[in-house]
């Protein structure tokens, strides 16, 4: 994609995580319970992807490894529709709570 000189170019990113994985619930919803909770991420991403397709918009989707492991078809669709895929770590752990080794392990786990 090329842009004319002096044109406005915007960046758009999406955090691909489920409702129970947002920071507001950290300390309220235990990570060990995630498997038993109602999953909405695929349905919500479908809606976002459709809106972006309708508007001919591309974005970067920052995806949790936890979500990627459970929804590989969703990640393939994101890429197939021309969006960029990026890592948001394994399970949304805040980097300032991790030491260097834990951070490296989290990124490596998410990469796989």
Regions found by a protein language model. Name each.
Residues 1-112:
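Catalytic alpha-helical scaffold of carbohydrate-active enzymes acting on polysaccharides/glycoconjugates
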């Amino acid at each position: 994609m090329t842009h004319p000189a002096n044109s406005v170019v915007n960046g758009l990113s999406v955090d691909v995580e489920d409702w129970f994985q947002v920071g507001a619930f950290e300390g309220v919803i235990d990570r060990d319970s995630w498997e038993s909770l109602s999953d909405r991420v695929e349905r919500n991403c479908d809606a976002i992807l459709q809106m972006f397709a309708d508007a001919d918009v591309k974005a970067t989707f920052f995806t949790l490894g936890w979500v990627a492991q459970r929804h590989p078809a969703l990640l393939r669709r994101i890429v197939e529709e021309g969006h960029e895929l990026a890592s948001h770590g394994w399970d949304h752990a805040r980097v300032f709570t991790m030491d260097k080794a834990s951070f490296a392990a989290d990124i490596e786990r998410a990469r796989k």
